[in-house]
């Protein structure tokens, strides 16, 4: 948890999960100070090490939303993905889950009118919404109260665990997406180690994709255009680029949502990450770094040069 020393943040837990998940979800609250919202942030991480589940996952605390998008995961053989819905408010929420896949958008019965009581959470298996989908995108719409949505995803390849991740939600579709710090690794021929997933939910679009090396030394590959059909997710293999860290930028002619998947490999001990589109930081903000080794902050300027000051926060 990071924030002012006098923020007086309080922590509670949500219960009531149903499905293949155990434990409670923490909720962090901080009251306004002198009529001004308190800047506070929190993050957590977990490491799995069992016969069928191996990997590291980190997640930041986020405010609940009336609408959000989950770009990531799969419902094919070997995938075990769970949609987590949490209602930290004081009144019930009713949630609708719409899934975009290779046949377009659908709202299956198991995704309709999901009631989440105040202070409770629900777990919905992704495979129960749309089975056999390689590149799904889920739209989460809540009425009555905003909810926090996330996607817990893991994969097993022929009995070999391939990693775990907690996919963060995207607040809305936009004509510009920025995904900083995406890792591109060298893989064997025919193995897609870094994949960008895009969806234009409302109208056909053309997306221009640019990869900008974080180290400013690696030559930047040429940008390229991707045609997007409304309502159909599109996956783009980025593996052929020089190994390293990149900022993935997407500019589109219509609002889109997207995220980038990257794996450390396909053998024993492999893990993966989903890089959701990062929110724009226009005002002073607080960032909490989840426990883990080798953590770094990656920033990307939207247009032109920018000067950023990073100041350690007491207790952060």
Model-derived segments and spans:
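Short acidic, flexible loop segments centered on an aromatic residue
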Residues: 85-107, 142-143, 192-219, 251-252, ...
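Long, internal scaffold/assembly segments composed of regular secondary structure
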Residues: 168-254
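Structural beta-strand/beta-sheet cores of well-ordered domains, especially the beta-sheet scaffolds
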Residues: 81, 93, 112, 122, ...
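Intrinsically disordered, low-complexity Pro/Gly/Ser/Thr-rich segments with frequent PxxP/GP/PP motifs
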Residues: 5-24, 104-137, 217-245, 313-316
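Intrinsically disordered, low-complexity linker/loop segments enriched in Gly/Pro
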Residues: 67-76, 89-116, 124, 175-186
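Hydrophobic, ordered structural segments
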Residues: 18-55, 84, 88-93, 115-162, ...
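Conserved functional hotspot residues at active sites or interaction interfaces
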Residues: 1, 44-84, 147-201, 256-304
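Extracytoplasmic low-complexity, Pro/Thr/Ser/Ala/Gly-rich segments
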Residues: 1-37, 171-183, 286
